[in-house]
From Swiss-Prot:
Entry keyword Amino-acid biosynthesis: yes
Record-linked PROSITE patterns: SHIKIMATE_KINASE (PS01128)
Gene name in the database record: aroK
Cofactor: Mg(2+)
Subunit field text: Monomer.
Organism: Helicobacter pylori (strain J99 / ATCC 700824) (Campylobacter pylori J99)
Official protein name in the record: Shikimate kinase
Amino acid sequence: MQHLVLIGFMGSGKSSLAQELGLALKLEVLDTDMIISERVGLSVRGIFEELGEDNFRMFEKNLIDELKTLKTPHIISTGGGIVMHENLKGLGTTFYLKMDFETLIKRLNQKEREKRPLLNNLTQAKELFEKRQALYEKNASFIIDARGGLNNSLKQVLQFIA
């Protein structure tokens, strides 16, 4: 078994699904944003504000290469922009948690939105969402309809890997 990699726009449920998959499959869960935050000593928002998005993307790219060297399979929850990296290919079996923009925004309360620097301006966020959709689909081994909630997404992933 390879890594199971969850991709999708911020707020699509990647972190929650990763935890459930980890329990169901008895695999360790890794969260790329959390790993980067812990290493740098700043929140994702803090990294964007103090070091810039380019540095965050460099940390992300380097982490992908590092994760490829792991010998055992993991569940990997990724940041929404990870699909911009060519080196994502070959990391594992990717599952795109697909959801429409309006549903994503409804799922995130104000506090959650404040943690996500790219959601400061909803018009720009929607443009980013639309640009990234093609990248998510291009990088996906499987597309998960995430509108049905966590349990439904979990069932879909488990069916694909059965």
